[in-house]
Design a protein with these regions (language model features):
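A binding-site-centric feature that preferentially detects glycan-recognition modules on secreted/surface proteins
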Residues: 1-173
């Protein structure tokens, strides 16, 4: 049976107005302080996520600022079938969604102490290249046992995303 080609369709009219999921403060701290805060607040930081934070391309902003975030299913961005990360980025750009700084994932994990078991979502960001040369982005999840997790997941061209997956992205200022 032949595989269907990944597709996206134009977003429905008016979909550029997304509700604010969270207003999040980013910047004003070190990588070490961020990881310590996650550990202290009971958020498991996966090995890959720790490696991503340690990379030179993960740079917390020097001064604080607030960004507005939206959270939607990929289908809201016009995704109708399984797609690659580059397709997700294109669909997001078409509706005005903005990539967030990598540190937003860790800061968001700190803001969700009551994240419900089974809740999980991707972060729309520029990938961080791992030690293996593969691109990775952050993924936040609350395991079925209630453990909150900040994870790194590869987004190479072989990974596919289905329309029901959720993503958090920035809203224009």
């Amino acid at each position: 049976m032949p595989r269907r080609k990944p597709t996206t369709t134009p977003a429905p009219a008016g979909s550029r107005l997304f509700p604010v999921y969270r207003a999040l403060e980013v910047g004003g701290g070190s990588k070490a302080a961020l990881v310590q805060a996650l550990d202290r607040n009971g958020c498991y930081v996966g090995r890959c996520a720790r490696e991503m934070i340690a990379r030179a391309s993960f740079t917390p902003a020097g001064s604080s600022r607030t960004i507005k975030l939206a959270r939607v299913q990929l289908s809201t961005l016009g995704v109708t079938d399984w797609v690659t990360w580059s397709d997700v980025l294109k669909a997001a750009a078409k509706v005005g969604a903005e990539k967030v700084p990598a540190e937003a994932a860790a800061r968001l994990a700190l803001e969700l102490p009551d994240q419900q078991p089974g809740d999980h979502f991707w972060i729309l960001m520029d990938p961080i290249t791992g030690q293996d040369g593969e691109p990775y982005v952050f993924y936040l999840a609350a395991h079925d046992d209630g453990e909150r997790r900040l994870l790194g997941r590869y987004v190479s061209s072989i990974r596919r995303f289905f329309p029901h997956r959720e993503i958090v992205f920035g809203l224009p200022a």
